[in-house]
Amino acid sequence: MATPILPFAALVALLMPLSATRTKHRFMVEYSVNASPKILYPYLASPSGLAQWFCQEVRLEENQRYNFIWDNQSHFAELNSHRTNRSVRFVFLDQEKRSMPDANYLDFTIEESQLTQEVFLRVLDYSDETDDIELQEMWDGLVQQLRELVGG
C-alpha cells in the first residue's frame, strides 16, 4: 500500500513549531489568601516553596533558570522579573533551555487592600491551554493547596 501524500498546507503545519500554529490564551484569576505577602511570597518564588504546592519538584539551575517537574517531565523557565513580596514571573523555555518567541509564562502577583488589609493572589497563566473551565479547576486546586500551607 502506498504512503498517502499530504497536501502542502498539512505538510507545512507539521513542520512548523507549535507556537507558530497555535494562538496563546491569557487566563487570569484572583484568590483571597489569608496570609501576609511576606509569608506568601517564598511559596511563589523559591524552588522549595513552589515544590510544596505547584509541582512535583523544582530545581534552580544556572542563570536563574528553573526546572519545573510535572509527571517526571522537565519544563524549563527563567525568572523573568520579581519584586520581593509583590510579584514573580516565570517565562518558559524550549527543551534546549532557549528563549522562544511568544513563550508561555506564569505570573503571580500579590496585592493587599489598603482599606480591608485583605491579601489577594492574582495568577496570570499565558499558555496554549484554552479551556477556561479546566484552567479554573486546576488553579482552584493548586491555590487550595497553597492556602492550606500558609494557613489561609
Regions found by a protein language model. Name each.
Residues 51-96:
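Glycine-rich portal/gate segments that line the openings of hydrophobic small-molecule binding cavities
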Residues 40-41, 50, 79, 90, ...:
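Hydrophobic pocket/interface hotspot
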Residues 5-59:
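Hydrophobic ligand-binding cavity/cleft-lining segments
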Residues 95-148, 152:
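Beta-strand/loop substructures that line and gate deep hydrophobic ligand-binding cavities in soluble
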Residues 37-38, 80-86, 110-120:
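A short, structured loop/turn motif at beta-sheet edges
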Residues 28, 73-77, 100-107:
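Short, surface-exposed coil-to-beta transition loops
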Residues 30-34, 67-69, 78, 109:
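Generic structural detector for well-ordered beta-strands
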